[in-house]
Amino acid sequence: MKRIYKSCVAVLLLLAMLLSCVPALAAGSSHSYTTLQKAEALKTLGLFQGTNKGFELEKTLTREQAITLIVRLLGAEAEAKEKNPAHPFTDVLAWAGPYVGYGYQNALVKGVSETLFGYGKLVTEAQFLTMVLRLLQYEDDTDFTWNKSAELAEKLGLPVVPANSGEYTRGNAVDVIWALLETKFKSGGKTLAQTLIEKGVFTEKAYREVLGEDSSNIGAILPILRPDPDPKPDPDPKPDPDPKPDPDPDPDPEPTEQPVYVSPSGGSDGDGSKDAPFGSLEAVRDYLRENRSTELPTTVYLRGGTYVLNKTFELTAEDGGTEELPVTWRAYPGETVIITGSAGASLSAFEPVSGEMKEKLSPDAQKHVMVADASALDLGTISVGLTQSNFCIDAPLFSLDGQHMRLTRYPNSNSTEDWMHVETVDPTQTSGTYPKIKLTDETVLGWDHNAADRIYFGYFSYGWALHGFHGTLDPETGIVTATDASHYGSAAGLKPMLLYNAYESLDEPGEWYYDQMSGRLYIYPFADTTRNSTLRMTSSNFDLISVNGASYLNLEGLTVTSSKKDGIVMNNVDHCVIENCTLTSFEGRAVSIDNATYSGLKNSEVAYTSISAIYLNGGDYQTMEPGYDFITNCRIHDTNQYRTMNEGGVKFRGVKNTFSNNEVYNITDMALNFAIVGGGPTSLDCVIENNSFHDVVLNGKDMGAVYGGRDARCQGVVIRNNHFYNIANNDSSFPSFSANAVYLDDGLSGAAVTGNIFGPGASGEYLEAVKINCGHDTVITNDLFIDTLCAFNVYIAGNFAVGMTNDSGFGIAPSLRQVWNNELYTSRWPWMAALRDGETDVYIPNIFKNNVIIYTDAAPRGSETSAYPWVKTNDNQESKITGLDNNLVILKGEGDNRQLFVDYANGNYALIDSVLAQLPGFEQIDQSRIGVKSFPGNQKPAASGVSISGTAEVGQTITAAYTFSDADGDSEG
């Protein structure tokens, strides 16, 4: 909004406010600025940002922070965030992904290994200057060597630090960036500043202002705010002939909210004011139950710090609000609020591993592994075992300074291609049996510490059933005999397996092992760990926050972490929203929202859970009453750390609910499970749209990134305008099965799959983009398939009616019987009533038409004897699919077909006009709608576009105008 003030008093107040944020830069051409002044100027130009504690110029700079600066200096931040370029590194957190990806794709930065970026590691001067020189288009090993980058930088006029100056700081980087703006590229043409002005990163006027070269800038007004250091008396003072009274100050603005404050350092005598905040969340809640405003919305501001809970923080119906008077609990702008069930422990109790235990580790691990008595850490009871019919590892989750740690495993990979492949002995796929496997890996056979505690976790029977067991090892034969019964037994052949909880496999940063015999905890710390680092463990056995029966209650800007149960649980709520939150480290779910209407999760990051990270359900399928709930604009990753079977990263249920604009990645199994086995809630008329699914289904087969199965109540699901890429793995242990982007299983029917992009980036022979197993009445149209070897796989049962209605059929019959007498269902899907009445000719062919299928570096692999090699059916039943002749298929010719896309190399898969002309009914897919859109986070308000006019003299009027922005939209701004 635009606010214009025409009083001298108001202008002075405005300038005072601005000057508190932007130190004055000296006018003229001297440019003798302090590092702090440079940082403020660079912030004004959008090139440097602080933390919630200010610029912290004395602090060190990490590798991810360094590449973020470089990307901004190229004027490429918006492009990086929009495209989120791929990179091979597994240790990069979501926020840094676009910057690291851009830097990697443009040869600005490399990793510390093929798969590790070195996230959190401190950057050295040589490394930072190497990035800077690459930005200026100088080449490694041609123009300079990375370890002597300072020599070339100094020749170019860039500041370098003296030898033995200690660690490279953020302030050092600011000094370099400031000088870099006036440095020319290698070609000798324009300076970096000129290039950024041309790109629109900032204007020439803004640049001149920060240099003090524009007389209209704020610096030119500053003398009226500062006393003359050597004032001279007026030799002939004259009275003002027309004295004017001082203008009345503006009245206090009307309050727009009821603010209440709480702080972890607040005292028991706090009154909830900003200066005397309450000391606990319960104190605020109880105060508001008696004193909440009946005229204004209520906002509870949580001041920065860590709130350690010893029981669930409960909010109920009486704590909610109304549409006119909502209640919001939120972090104070610009401050970090952590709500946790773990007080944590300092690493000061740890010491380097020594003696016999040290000798058991790899040479590299011997240098880094640390150990402590678990009892001295006061983290709670630690145990490692199996639970849930041995489908789930029962172990805590650890984090170190907020970075997730992993139970030690061998090999260190999420992909079954890299796992050990063990031969099953005396296989039988019988429930309750004790599998046997034969180990041949010499490394593992050489290990001997606490062998009985090891967990053998693998796909021993089916490609979709990851489960585990303890066992006894015969060192002479290498045969391991399970001591835990298996739900599915084992199948013949070589099967992929991980070994968990073997001490000797503790060999990479972020791993941990607990010795259950000695009670000692071993960790391999991250590179930036110090003795003051905080180790947290999921020890509290309660949900952290519960909202039950409330309406119009919002939680914003919080970091919620560490519990054996769930993070935030909402039940029977209406118009309750979790926004701008980070939720990590839960043995249960990070978020569970049930029986809800108009409620959901948005603009948040969710990661590192033992099982599904999010559960959402709202609406009644029997009455078709909608929930209108949502999960939108979230990053969801690294879920299902200990269980994948029938889970998925997100369990999405309800009626007319929406899953939109999310990025879901780095999940070994299903990303989104919208229906599986009728009995509980289902999905009806739900929409899954504008999402990016990538690097999922990393280790299983016969499952989908988006999966629904065995539920006749699930109808009308729309899957549209999503992008699926880097799906699946190339493991050949189950050659008859693949992974899928979208999988409708065991008779699930009545969906629409439209406007999606499948590929590129599939993995070998084992990806089928869309699969339907026994279902019917689904439409797949206007989709783009890029290098998907099999675009569509459909299994068409010989007797559809029997499979749907017989309990020994597809497994869907019990759920069908729940709705085939429901007129709301049978009026929309008459085939249900027909099956109820004994009719058999009810199969409605699936439709696959108006799709574009392009191969750039692969050939289709579907039914080899079919006229449609990009389709796969059982018994060549392509004739039972409608529309196969109405698709555009472009096979690889002499070229690679990448020229058929607007900008394939940079991930723009819009089709050129000549392709669109070949399939007139195809609508161009709008990629700009896909994925996470930037969300404001917990930001402070800001003023920009300041202009001042008039005569800056006492008694005269000057006019100030500025644009006030408050990204969060909160009243505190």
Feature annotation, model-predicted:
Residues 259-572, 584, 906-908, 918-935:
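Extracellular polysaccharide-degrading/modifying enzymes targeting complex plant/algal/animal polysaccharides
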Residues 42, 235, 262, 946-948, ...:
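Extracellular/surface recognition and adhesion modules
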Residues 259, 297-299, 304-306, 312, ...:
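Detector for repetitive beta-architecture
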Residues 2-37, 43-98, 105-167, 180-228:
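Feature responds to low-complexity, polar/acidic, surface-exposed segments characteristic
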Residues 936-973:
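Ser/Thr/Pro/Gly-rich low-complexity disordered regions
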Residues 322, 565-569, 587-593, 607-907:
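Glycine- and acidic/polar-rich repeat regions and solenoidal domains
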Residues 216-256:
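Ser/Thr/Gly/Pro-rich low-complexity, disordered linker/stalk segments of secreted
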Residues 265-268, 899-905, 942-954:
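Short, solvent-exposed loop/edge segments of extracellular or virion-exposed proteins
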